Amino acid sequence: MSDATAALVSERVDKLLADVDPTAVDQAEFRGRQYDLGLAWVHFPEGYGGLGLPPVAQRDIDRRVYSAGAPYPGARHFFGLAMAGPTIVTNGDEAVKQRLLRRTFTGEDAWCQLFSEPGAGSDLAGLATRAVRDGDEWVISGQKVWNTLAHIADRGMLVARTDPEAPKHKGLTYFALDMHAPGVEVRPLRQITGEAEFNEVYLTEVRVPDADRIGDVGEGWRVSMTTLMNERTSIGGGGGGAPPRGSGAIAEAVRIWNEEAGDRSPANRDRLMRLWIEAEALRLTNIRAGQNRRAGNPGPEGSIAKLKFAEVNMAIYELCVDLLGADALVGFGYEMRRAENLGLTGPPGSARKMFLRSRANSIEGGTSEIQRNILGERVLGLPGEPRVDKDVPWSKVPR
């Protein structure tokens, strides 16, 4: 940061901490004041929770406010902070920005993502959920699936088809859905771990005000790319931006090596060191991806980080269960629980459970195969896969 930027950030943080004691007020009040001072998403424009400063300044802001006792927002607000906020500020109209951004940052609105469908996962543009205009409202019906933490969300980032006669990428529109609206039903999807972190969401003639539309009608695909770009980078960072060096899954592997490992062979020591190096390379790649994205210069790092996170996280938990040996076979229970946190990494002692949970890393947020296609076609310039539905109206595409 330049001296001028550092001075401005320091001045604003000093004012924030002088105005509001983070240990004496609730989280929403403190974060509301943080938003008003432009310290929420510091790279956003002024008036929208930012100061138009380089994104690197956010790290200094976060360090100071958390050191002063401000509570960390937690996984419940991950989707709003990492995905909905950037999507709204980039694509929303003035009224949407003023109405939703502050509530998203304070935590008054928790978000979920309503993209995938039973027949549209990797081929997201083939989604079938319909939105039909009725005056100043849209009537939306359809089904979404694999919706993380939808059961505790207030808003949903929803993409629906508004023009079935347009080609599949061109007939979509993006909405900020009220998850408490009549006609919204959330059902749990139980995982191999016993938890129900994911859900399926049924929409039955849900009425959504046109004021809750984000972006122009028919521009849903373009708007959704903003969301997906932020999602991939965030997942690459383990679900919460760039974590400290040596934290997350690799920290659990190191703990097991030091405290519980039954097989400290040279081969396993080599595996541990190689994975520590890969985890650190991934962390640095994700920092670079986040900075480039927030500066408006997104590159391939987001897809690289997402792809490598899946591979490294799975490999780390495989090493954990190998180090535990027979103890890894001891069950951890299969209790049905509606999760309130993202399950990308787990606390100490959860390696058995996380070994099973990590199997989903190469699927969620865009499969590893899709990430390789993106990198091959858009970065390396390789020819794309042949498409039979290009420029064909969605209604005419065989399904």
Give the location of each predicted region.
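Glycine-rich beta->alpha junctions and the first turn(s) of the following alpha-helix
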Residues: A4, V184-T285, N361, S395-P398
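C-terminal helix-coil-helix/basic helical segment that borders enzyme active sites and/or dimer interfaces
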Residues: V25, P266, E280-G343
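Amphipathic, small/basic residue-rich leader segments at the start of a protein or domain
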Residues: M1-F79, V96-R99, R103, V223, ...
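A structural signal for short hydrophobic beta-strand segments in well-ordered beta-sheet cores
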Residues: T129-V132
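N-terminal glycine-rich flavin-associated loop
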Residues: P73-A95, G121
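A short, Trp-centered hydrophobic/proline-enriched beta-strand micro-motif
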Residues: G107-F115, V159
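Glycine-rich phosphate/pyrophosphate-binding beta-alpha loops
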Residues: A120, V145-H151, I192-T193, A360-G365
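A short core secondary-structure module
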Residues: D136-E137, S141-L189
